[in-house]
């Protein structure tokens, strides 16, 4: 059960790493999953854009890209790349703290590895409902 945080071309200082790891593990457990290996890579817009172009052939900016490496149905493993530039900008746009937006994106990536998608209006609504539910269950101050 390893969760790691890395920075690539980003100077973002992630706070409360231990609390975040416990929270993400609790989310996975409630969804019926164990975490095998989960890597969060905090990066710049440019870095994530290059990954988007290279691996997904999408020439757009995004806040998150998730690569699933899971080998078992009840276990998740993957690399989750997230743009700290997008997190900061989205926090301002949505009028929430950077911490809250970061938590939303972190759980969003984990939910992708648990099989949730956001490709349709209905699936996006389900995912947002899950995000809101788990954000409300945090036991640490990330707001």
Question: What is the role of each PLM region?
Answer:
Residues 111:
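Conserved ATP-binding N-box helix of the HATPase_c
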Residues 1-103, 114-143:
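An acidic/histidine-cluster motif and surrounding catalytic segment
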């Amino acid at each position: 059960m390893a969760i790691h945080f890395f920075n690539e071309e980003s100077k973002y200082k992630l706070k409360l790493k231990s609390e975040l790891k416990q929270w993400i593990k609790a989310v996975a457990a409630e969804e019926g999953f164990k975490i095998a290996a989960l890597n969060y890579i905090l990066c710049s817009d440019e870095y994530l854009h290059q990954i988007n172009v290279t691996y997904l052939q999408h020439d757009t900016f995004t806040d998150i890209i998730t690569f699933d490496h899971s080998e078992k149905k009840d276990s998740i493993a993957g690399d989750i790349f997230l743009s700290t530039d997008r997190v900061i900008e989205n926090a301002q746009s949505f009028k929430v703290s950077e911490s809250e937006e970061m938590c939303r994106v972190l759980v969003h990536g984990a939910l992708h590895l648990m099989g949730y998608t956001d490709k349709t209006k209905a699936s996006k609504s389900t995912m947002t409902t899950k995000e809101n539910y788990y954000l409300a269950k945090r036991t640490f101050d990330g707001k």
